[in-house]
Amino acid sequence: MSLTLEQVKRIAHLARIEISDDEALTTQGHLNGIFQLIEQMQAVDTTGIEPMAHAQDVSQRLREDAVSEGDRRAAYQAVAPEIEAGLYLVPKVIE
């Protein structure tokens, strides 16, 4: 798969990116290079190879979840300008 110059310009337009002809040509080359790499990767025969989640088979040592602070909701809401029913009230910014 490869992109034409017109397709690159259309994608830039849809993304609301202003792009010159030189930049579009450079971007076309970069994107087509990425697509070629993807095609090469898809051409590799991976039958019989088990998918892996990580490059190295290492497990993490995890600690137990423990509460490190108590409930401080009342202290935080005591300094809030406005609260109602336990919720913070903020000014309306979208009409």
Curated annotation (Swiss-Prot):
Keywords, comma-separated and alphabetical: ATP-binding, Ligase, Nucleotide-binding, Protein biosynthesis
Domain of life: Bacteria
Membership in a protein family: Belongs to the GatC family.
EC number assigned by the record: 6.3.5.-
GO MF annotation: an example: glutaminyl-tRNA synthase (glutamine-hydrolyzing) activity
Native organism: Dechloromonas aromatica (strain RCB)
A Pfam family of this chain: GatC
Protein name: Aspartyl/glutamyl-tRNA(Asn/Gln) amidotransferase subunit C
Biological process per Gene Ontology, one example term: regulation of translational fidelity
Lineage: Bacteria, Pseudomonadati, Pseudomonadota, Betaproteobacteria, Rhodocyclales
Subunit structure: Heterotrimer of A, B and C subunits.
Main function: Allows the formation of correctly charged Asn-tRNA(Asn) or Gln-tRNA(Gln) through the transamidation of misacylated Asp-tRNA(Asn) or Glu-tRNA(Gln) in organisms which lack either or both of asparaginyl-tRNA or glutaminyl-tRNA synthetases. The reaction takes place in the presence of glutamine and ATP through an activated phospho-Asp-tRNA(Asn) or phospho-Glu-tRNA(Gln).
InterPro entries reported for this sequence: Asp/Glu-ADT_sf_sub_c, GatC
Catalytic activity: L-glutamyl-tRNA(Gln) + L-glutamine + ATP + H2O = L-glutaminyl-tRNA(Gln) + L-glutamate + ADP + phosphate + H(+); L-aspartyl-tRNA(Asn) + L-glutamine + ATP + H2O = L-asparaginyl-tRNA(Asn) + L-glutamate + ADP + phosphate + 2 H(+)
